[in-house]
Structures are given as structure tokens and as C-alpha cells.
Regions:
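Repeated loop/turn-to-beta-strand initiation elements of outer-membrane beta-barrel proteins
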Residues: 19, 68-71, 117, 184-186
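Bacterial N-terminal signal peptides
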Residues: 1-6
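Hydrophobic core residues within well-ordered beta-strands of beta-rich domains
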Residues: 19, 55-57, 69, 103-105, ...
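Residues on the lipid-exposed face of transmembrane beta-strands in outer-membrane beta-barrel proteins
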Residues: 23, 59-63, 73, 107-111, ...
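Outer-membrane beta-barrel channels and translocator barrels
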Residues: 16, 66, 78, 114-118, ...
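Sec/Tat signal peptide C-region and signal peptidase I cleavage site
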Residues: 9-13
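Extracellular/periplasm-exposed beta-strand and loop segments of Gram-negative cell-envelope proteins
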Residues: 29-55, 77-105, 113, 130-167, ...
Length: 232
């Protein structure tokens, strides 16, 4: 009986030196808010922006330094983020006003509770994420509307381009892993990334002069990650 117990308990061991790779589904749910759009420093009253929910595939690699302490790197396939106007910018004809690809790889330190040979292993983690955006595209309908705004209706043909600031964000995570055997497991985690960014829009007038607009957006997503893991 003692030998049988040892064999059984060791069948799920995730101990010091173990590596776990996980692949699964991520859902990003922004808890967003925004400041009004500013055009050349002038506030466009009752304007704002919001960000849609996103779904993507994610991968994580975890290395356990001890039976309980681990470091984890997490990255998702960058989802397409739609930004929609609110208030006076809420017209369906110009929305979403812009979209972009969001990159947000994260690095965390994690603490696993319970013994290394437990089937259920809850965990808490804290870390940092570097967030940046590329392939920023302005909706042509919004571009025409913005052109009319910045020229007081003189033209709707002034082209615009946009950029979004990169930023660092803290990451707070709670998770639970269930081990089927010494190799395979499933995990679920919920993370929170509080961060804000600014979008900058440059509109070029027919004269060649440029008009600068910007909007500050607090994104603050809650990220759910459901995954299958393999230990080696």
C-alpha cells in the first residue's frame, strides 16, 4: 500500500525543473473608458471611444524553479481590435472609426498552491506586459467625417493616418490547473491588465497643412485563458 500510494501521488508531479507548454483560447473583455476627442487641442464635446471584445489563440510556457514558484511567458496571436466612437461619434455610418492589431506578450512570476503531486493546483501570478499596436487603419467614412470637422465643412477629402502609443502594464492573474496524468493537464485563468493609451490622428489638408487630433483610452481588459497543457 505505501508503494502504491507513492506511485499514484507521483503520477501528477509538477515539481522543480518541470516545464509546461499550454495552448488554448483567450477572450479579452475591455473595461474601457475614454476622454473626449481633441482636435488641435480643442475638445470635441460629448465624444468618446470604446473597444470591442476580442477572441484569439494563446500559448504559454511555464518553468517551475521550485515545486511552487514558477515563471511564465504568455503570448496570443495578435487580435484585430475595433475602436468605435461614442456620443457624437456613435453614428453607425462611420463605425468602427478605426482598427488595429494589438500585441501584448506578458511575463509573470507565479505561485502554485497545494503539493506538486496534486491533481488540482490553484495559482496566483503577477507580472508585466508590453503592449503595442500596428496595422492601424482609419475607416474611410470616419476619415471623411473628421475631414469635415477639422476644415469646418470646407472639404471631406482630407486624408488621415493614425498611430497608437505603446505602453507597459502590470498583470494580475488567478488560475487553476487540473492534471490528468504526469504529462497532460487543463487550465483556466483570469488576468487583469490595467492600462491606458493614446491614439493620434494626423489629417493633411489640401494646402499641405496638418491637423492633429488625439484621444486617450483606458482599456483595462480582463483576459480569460482556457488551455490544454503538456509537461516535459
Amino acid at each position: 500500500m505505501p508503494l502504491a500510494f507513492v506511485v499514484s501521488s507521483g503520477a501528477f508531479a509538477q515539481s522543480a525543473g518541470s516545464n509546461v507548454v499550454q495552448f488554448g483560447w483567450m477572450h479579452l473583455a475591455p473595461q474601457d473608458s475614454s476622454d473626449p476627442l481633441k482636435i488641435q487641442g480643442n475638445t470635441l464635446r460629448n465624444s468618446g471611444a470604446s473597444v470591442n471584445n476580442q477572441d484569439t489563440a494563446g500559448i504559454a510556457l511555464t518553468h517551475l524553479f521550485t515545486d511552487h514558484i514558477a515563471v511564465e511567458g504568455v503570448v496570443g496571436i495578435p487580435p484585430r481590435v475595433d475602436v468605435s466612437g461614442t456620443g457624437v461619434l456613435a453614428s453607425p455610418s462611420i463605425n468602427p472609426v478605426a482598427n488595429a492589431r494589438q500585441w501584448s506578450p506578458a511575463l509573470l512570476m507565479k505561485y502554485y498552491f497545494t503539493d506538486a503531486d496534486s491533481k488540482f493546483r490553484p495559482s496566483l501570478g503577477v507580472g508585466v506586459s508590453y503592449i503595442w499596436f500596428n496595422h492601424v487603419h482609419v475607416n474611410p467614412a470616419f476619415e471623411r467625417s473628421l475631414s469635415g470637422l477639422v476644415t469646418s465643412g470646407a472639404t471631406t477629402a482630407a486624408p488621415s493616418n493614425a498611430t497608437v502609443d505603446s505602453t507597459w502594464a502590470p498583470v494580475f492573474e488567478a488560475g487553476l490547473m487540473y492534471n490528468f496524468d504526469k504529462h497532460w493537464s487543463v487550465s483556466a485563468s483570469v488576468s487583469y491588465l490595467p492600462f491606458s493609451t493614446k491614439a493620434h490622428i494626423t489629417t493633411t489638408l489640401p494646402t499641405g497643412a496638418q491637423v492633429h487630433s488625439e484621444a486617450k483610452l483606458a482599456v483595462n481588459p480582463i483576459v480569460t485563458f482556457l488551455s490544454m497543457g503538456y509537461r516535459f
